[in-house]
Amino acid sequence: MARGCLCCLKYTMFLFNLIFWLCGCGLLGVGIWLSVSQGNFATFSPSFPSLSAANLVIAIGTIVMVTGFLGCLGAIKENKCLLLSFFIVLLIILLAELILIILFFVYMDKVNENAKQDLKEGLLLYNTENNVGLKNAWNIIQAEMRCCGVTDYTDWYPVLGENTVPDRCCMENSQGCGRNSTTPLWRTGCYEKVKLWFDDNKHVLGTVGMCILIMQILGMAFSMTLFQHIHRTGKKYDA
């Protein structure tokens, strides 16, 4: 009976972590594809030049893939050392997430202010030779979200000149339209648009976050239960 429960728990955890590992592989693949296909598609922030969408997805994918592999191997080998390592890794990730969320809400006003300032400083690099990625990023977000600048369209004036904005700020985009002072522009800043997007999708984002939290807690519960079960039955596959 005990052995049957152990087998059931072992393969349940293996399948759970196999899905986890496959998700990590998928994220890693998407990150590599973004890095290769988008070239210098970079971050908006000059303070964190390596924090691009591609690098972020690659980092998350790698962490998920390694964690999933650790859980798969620990479960199928019934290795207490690997199971305990898997539990500790998930616990560290969970605590880091909670700390970041708490800090974000405690210092929300300061985060918003610093983010706006950093993004405005990034605008100064818009037309520089080595920052094609930043230029592409701004062009895409302004076209997709129908916004202009960080707080509003006037953020571009110190960068491109008085009454001059990127062409993607125009409601009807055409070559050179940003230099025409009579052209209708998107007047809302992109920072506000992004905040509105998060607010409109907060229920979906909350659901996704809750699913991730449940998966982490289940992973920790499975690993510790299997660890205790192996310990009680005297199964020894320790490295």
Swiss-Prot record:
GO terms for molecular function: signaling receptor binding. Glycans are attached at residue 180. The chain crosses the membrane at residues 14-34, 56-76, 86-106, 204-224. Glycosylated. It comes from the Eukaryota. Signal peptide: none annotated. It is a multi-pass membrane protein. GO terms for cellular component: membrane; migrasome; tetraspanin-enriched microdomain. GO terms for biological process: collagen-activated tyrosine kinase receptor signaling pathway; mitocytosis; neutrophil homeostasis; platelet aggregation; receptor diffusion trapping; regulation of mitochondrial membrane potential. InterPro entries: Tetraspanin/Peripherin, Tetraspanin_animals, Tetraspanin_CS, Tetraspanin_EC2_sf. Strongly expressed in megakaryocytes, platelets and lung. Weakly expressed in bone marrow, brain and kidney (at protein level). PROSITE patterns: TM4_1. Keywords: Glycoprotein, Membrane, Transmembrane, Transmembrane helix. Residues 1-13, 77-85, 225-239 are cytoplasmic. Residues 35-55, 107-203 are extracellular. It is found in: Membrane. Belongs to the tetraspanin (TM4SF) family. Found in a complex with GP6. This is Tetraspanin-9. It comes from Mus musculus (Mouse).
